[in-house]
């Protein structure tokens, strides 16, 4: 998912913590 793959996880701290 997003939280396992940069830059998505870096760009979505409100989702990924």
From Swiss-Prot:
Tissues in which the UniProt entry reports expression: Expressed by the venom duct.
UniProt keyword Disulfide bond present: yes
GO CC annotation: extracellular region; host cell postsynaptic membrane
Gene Ontology terms, MF aspect: acetylcholine receptor inhibitor activity; ion channel regulator activity; toxin activity
Listed InterPro entries: Conotoxin_a-typ, Conotoxin_a-typ_CS
Protein localization: Secreted
Cysteines engaged in disulfide bonds, as pairs: 2-8, 3-16
Region annotation (Ser-Xaa-Pro motif, crucial for potent interaction with nAChR) ranges: 4-6
Residues modified to Glycine amide: 17
Family the entry assigns: Belongs to the conotoxin A superfamily.
Protein name per the record: Alpha-conotoxin In1761
Protein species of origin: Conus inscriptus
């Amino acid at each position: 998912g997003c939280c396992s793959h940069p830059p998505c996880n870096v760009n979505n701290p409100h989702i990924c913590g």
